């Protein structure tokens, strides 16, 4: 790939930052040489009921994986996100809700949020929810979703959120695995102008004979649409909260008490419930939010993620509110009712920090200047990217077009399992290279290992990305299956947390995530990350999106199969076919030239925007008899279209 352009730290950011480069280097050094001392000091970023005296008790040893932080301290998450701000900023806005329809919006101040959360906490208690019980949320993006999360944390219940786009089968599987006692949902959700039948899906999920633990379903009225009602089970949110007190003292929780379970979609098999606990998670969420986004008091923060994903948990709800920020909760999608919706929301609410995903950026980029029509986005100070590696071309477009070349981009790498951001630039400290997640956050010790598990000491290197020691936000276990936790994350490379990603490190020590290790191709003995070839393809001016998979090849071992979506107004031709192959040859080298170009209008994506490569691999190899679970796809019809197109390829 061509050498990346370097963007130095902006002077205006450096002048008011929490950490310039010297501060970052000093803090990072302390965090890895003296983690006890570092986290003993920075653990105080949250309020403790009983202060901790133990800081870090962690082991990655085979058969003894055990992760505990701040173990003897006690605290309450909702008190940290709400109560501690009331004296100073009770009348400040906590949550701005922007509806799917641009005419719908409302705000909640910290005082109002306190009242709502206390009321709903008491309502949950009335429905029989006790400390330690699991509550399942299957909610639209309305303020009540955040209220329900915070109410669970207030009374010591464990929430498990299932994204509102998941099917009844997927919902039932998560309810069964988590032993949830109550479901909180809405009559319907609204997204992109369409109603989502949430209550209907819950009703269907609860007909599964293996669902045995649910006693109540609390229903928030979002649309007033027609729904079935089960008299002894279903309860309206507004009725449940009308007759209870608006005072609810926060439950004193131990640092290692479970806070939430969040299921990651394993491509096959039983859902994997990632368990996060109270103290370490909140410290890490609060700390990363403050430093990564260089948050300054009074700023407005917009994370476009759904609360059903880890990004929504950590950087829409807990991180911003623990810091006393204004956080935007957006019900819609970035391109509805028009392509410039995201930019319009930025202007309307004077957003200072925008955190979104490469898939949204690329979708807008394909529409060119339509994405910013009639807006100036002058309020933006910091922009972020999350969810997958961002290719340099999309990075540059985001920086120049959305950000007017004045907002640094924090390209953040992390996972559901990590609780918070692990590798990232800091706005006032890090010179930026488009496409690189740059350097580790405080306390995070990344390393590259070869396939035998040997740490690669060279500065410039490529290998499997591992983390050598624990950090406070790390998941503690797979719910109900600690053996699976050890097996999945600690057995491949002994004594290390294996991320499942490959990465390269450049001569400046910057990390470049190359994609999942199972997305590594081996062509004639050459290892190549699919992300690198995809980046080269997307850099072509006519290409909107690309996905690469490997298919078996008699001579090369693997051949390169490229799915390519063109920009609006472009059409596949024989000339373009040759041009694209020549382009990749020029960008990376002959070894990376795609063997097959499969033109298509759309790629199969989950509702969080991730491309389902597992399905693409099967279609490319002609193995379409068992495509596995397609219930998490945003548009399942894409699959049949791809299979038909594949049949027509010579």
UniProtKB/Swiss-Prot annotation:
Positions with a binding annotation for CoA:
191-194, 311, 335, 524, 585
Keyword hit for Lyase: no
What role is this protein assigned?
A: Catalyzes the conversion of acetate into acetyl-CoA (AcCoA), an essential intermediate at the junction of anabolic and catabolic pathways. AcsA undergoes a two-step reaction. In the first half reaction, AcsA combines acetate with ATP to form acetyl-adenylate (AcAMP) intermediate. In the second half reaction, it can then transfer the acetyl group from AcAMP to the sulfhydryl group of CoA, forming the product AcCoA.
**The protein's name:** Acetyl-coenzyme A synthetase
Please report the organism this UniProt entry assigns to the protein: Vibrio vulnificus (strain YJ016)
Question: Which cofactors are required for activity?
Answer: Mg(2+)
PTM (free text): Acetylated. Deacetylation by the SIR2-homolog deacetylase activates the enzyme.
Keyword annotations from UniProtKB, A to Z = Acetylation, ATP-binding, Ligase, Magnesium, Metal-binding, Nucleotide-binding
Q: Name one GO molecular function term.
A: metal ion binding
Q: Which Cys pairs are S-S linked?
A: none
Show the taxonomic lineage: Bacteria, Pseudomonadati, Pseudomonadota, Gammaproteobacteria, Vibrionales
For the modification N6-acetyllysine, the affected residues are: 610
NCBIfam families tied to this protein: Ac_CoA_lig_AcsA, PRK00174.1
Binding-site residues for ATP, renumbered to this chain: 387-389, 411-416, 501, 516, 527
Query: Its family?
Result: Belongs to the ATP-dependent AMP-binding enzyme family.
List of residues binding Mg(2+): 538, 540, 543
Q: Does the keyword Ligase apply?
A: yes
The EC number of this protein is 6.2.1.1
According to UniProt, the reaction catalysed is: acetate + ATP + CoA = acetyl-CoA + AMP + diphosphate
* GO CC annotations on file: cytosol
Q: Which gene encodes it?
A: acsA
């Amino acid at each position: 790939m061509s050498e990346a352009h370097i963007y130095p730290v902006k002077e205006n950011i450096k002048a008011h930052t929490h950490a310039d480069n010297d501060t970052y280097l000093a803090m990072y050094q302390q965090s890895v040489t003296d983690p006890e001392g570092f986290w003993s000091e920075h653990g105080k970023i949250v309020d403790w009921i009983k202060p901790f005296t133990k800081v870090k008790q962690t082991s990655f040893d085979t058969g003894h994986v055990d992760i505990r932080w701040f173990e003897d301290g006690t605290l309450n998450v909702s008190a940290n996100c709400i109560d501690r701000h009331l004296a100073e900023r009770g009348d400040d806005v906590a949550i701005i809700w922007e509806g799917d329809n641009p005419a719908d919006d409302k705000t909640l101040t910290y005082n109002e949020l306190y009242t709502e959360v206390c009321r709903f906490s008491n309502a949950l208690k009335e429905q029989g929810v006790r400390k330690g019980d699991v509550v399942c949320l299957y909610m639209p993006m309305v303020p009540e979703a955040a209220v329900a999360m915070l109410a669970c944390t207030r009374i010591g219940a464990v929430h498990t959120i299932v994204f509102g786009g998941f099917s009844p089968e997927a919902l039932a599987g998560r309810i069964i695995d988590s032993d949830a006692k109550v479901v909180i949902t809405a009559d319907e959700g609204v997204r992109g102008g369409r109603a989502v039948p949430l209550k209907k899906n819950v009703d269907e999920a609860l007909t599964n004979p293996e669902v045995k633990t649910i006693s109540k379903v609390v229903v928030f009225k979002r649309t007033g649409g027609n729904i079935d009602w089960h008299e002894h089970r279903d309860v309206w949110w507004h009725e449940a909260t009308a007759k209870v007190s608006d005072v609810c003292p926060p439950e004193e929780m131990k640092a290692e008490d479970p806070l939430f379970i969040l299921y990651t979609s394993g491509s096959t098999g039983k859902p994997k419930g990632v368990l996060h606990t109270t103290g370490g998670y909140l410290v890490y969420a609060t700390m990363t939010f403050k430093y990564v986004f260089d948050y300054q008091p009074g700023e407005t923060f917009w994370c476009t993620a759904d609360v059903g994903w880890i990004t929504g948990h950590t950087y829409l709800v807990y991180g911003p509110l623990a810091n006393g920020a204004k956080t935007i909760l957006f019900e819609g999608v970035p391109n509805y009712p028009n392509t410039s919706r995201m930019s319009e929301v930025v202007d309307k609410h004077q957003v200072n920090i925008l955190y979104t995903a490469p898939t949204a950026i690329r979708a807008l980029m394909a529409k060119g200047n339509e994405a910013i029509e009639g807006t100036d986005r002058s309020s933006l100070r910091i922009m972020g990217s999350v969810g997958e590696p961002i290719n340099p071309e999309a990075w540059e477009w985001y920086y120049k077009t959305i950000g007017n070349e004045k907002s640094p981009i924090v390209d953040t790498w992390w996972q559901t399992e990590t609780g918070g951001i692990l590798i990232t630039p800091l706005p006032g400290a890090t010179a930026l290279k488009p496409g690189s997640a740059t350097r580790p956050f405080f306390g995070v010790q990344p390393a590259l290992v070869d396939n035998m598990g040997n740490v690669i000491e060279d500065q410039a290197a490529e290998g499997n990305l591992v983390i050598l020691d624990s950090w406070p936000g790390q998941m503690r276990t797979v719910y109900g299956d600690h053996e699976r936790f050890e097996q999945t994350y600690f057995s491949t490379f002994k004594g290390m947390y294996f991320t499942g990603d490959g990465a390269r490190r450049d001569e400046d020590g910057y990390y470049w995530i190359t994609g999942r290790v199972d997305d590594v191709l081996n062509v004639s003995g050459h290892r190549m990350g699919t992300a690198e070839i995809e980046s080269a393809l997307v850099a072509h001016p006519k290409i909107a999106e690309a996905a690469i998979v490997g298919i078996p090849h008699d001579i090369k071992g693997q051949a390169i199969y490229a799915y390519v979506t063109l920009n609006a107004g472009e059409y596949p031709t024989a000339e373009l076919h040759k041009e694209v192959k020549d382009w990749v040859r020029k960008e990376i080298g002959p070894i990376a030239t795609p063997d097959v170009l499969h033109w298509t209008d759309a790629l199969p994506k989950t509702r969080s925007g991730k491309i389902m490569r597992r399905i693409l691999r099967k279609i490319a190899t002609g193995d379409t008899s068992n495509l596995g679970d397609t219930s998490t796809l945003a548009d399942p019809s894409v699959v049949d279209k791809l299979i038909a197109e594949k049949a027509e390829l010579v």
